Amino acid sequence: MPTYQDISRHTSNVILDPEISSEIWAKAIDESAFMQLANRITIPGSGVKVQTITGEPTANWVDETNSKPVSFHSFGNKTITPYKLAVIEPFSDEFRRDKAALYAECVRRLPAAIAKKFDSTIMSNSAPGSGFDVLGTGVSSIAIGGSDVYGAFVSADAAISTADGIMNGIALAPQGKSLVLGAVDNSGHPLFTAGVGSNTVGNILGANVTVAKGIYVSGTPAIVGVAGDFTGVRWGMVESIKMAISDQATLTYNDGSDHTLNLWQMNMFAVKVECEVTFAVMDKGQLVLLTNAVPTTTTTGA
């Protein structure tokens, strides 16, 4: 048996299925929380410098015949730069022929790998380069792991409003969704579910809620979500997501040791999914990280 990490009919835990027709493409937008909540912009491959509004003019009352007040917007600028995100997965020719449905599902899920990496990078403190914003630094946090989950979201809403924002979006990791679904009132009724027969989270304080795996950040405490005013949040893509299939390329990879895989020689082919994307936040004060910590209670003496 070969030692390289290809997917063939002999791959562990793969069950042969009858060949069926299946769609092989699903957009990464459907899998990414930030692609759903933020506003999309189209940018050139070299990036773009966008104008930002940092202050608003102020109106005032005026007595009859008096001079009218003069006030101005204040402006700034922000550089947004895209970076390439890609994944390649090799398959044997026999795998595509004998397990068409499973192959189709693997290809369909490749864009989801792009989406998960995009979200997890944004939630980290390590950007792929300058001009790409991440939330691991410069963003405050609110603990929602206690018994008063509703109160925690009110606190998040207050923090966002203090930064002159309106909470209109919440991205939850599956672990955060579980905390939210477990929130009940004094009668034991769920607070945020769309219904007792539903496994989804309804709007929270009027904010749209989306759930994605890439939001979770392990740690003590773990980050299980982010809430904020997404009006000033942008994600950009150069052109669109691209997918290509090749049976002529030579692949190199490392899984602890170096490997070279000649697709033509091995009767294999590979599927490549790639895109150039970026992420920008105009005001990090209008975003709040949600953790699974239990809020501390401060007591005062008599």
Identify the role of each PLM range.
Residues 1-23, 28, 41, 259-302:
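Protruding loop/beta-arch "assembly-hinge" segments enriched in small, turn-prone residues
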Residues 2-85, 112, 286:
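Assembly/oligomerization interface modules of large self-assembling protein complexes
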Residues 44, 140-269, 275, 299-302:
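Extended oligomerization regions of viral-like shell subunits
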Residues 51-54, 92, 173-175, 212, ...:
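Structured loops at beta-to-helix junctions and adjacent beta-edge loops in soluble globular domains
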Residues 56-58, 86, 95, 116, ...:
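Short loop/turn segments at secondary-structure transitions that flank enzyme active sites
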Residues 58-61, 99-100, 179-182, 189, ...:
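Short helix/loop capping segments that flank catalytic or ligand/cofactor-binding pockets
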Residues 62-68, 105, 185-187, 221-225, ...:
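Short, polar loop/linker segments at the starts of domains and inter-domain junctions
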Residues 76-79, 86-165, 187, 210, ...:
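Alpha-helical scaffold segments that mediate packing/assembly in large oligomeric complexes
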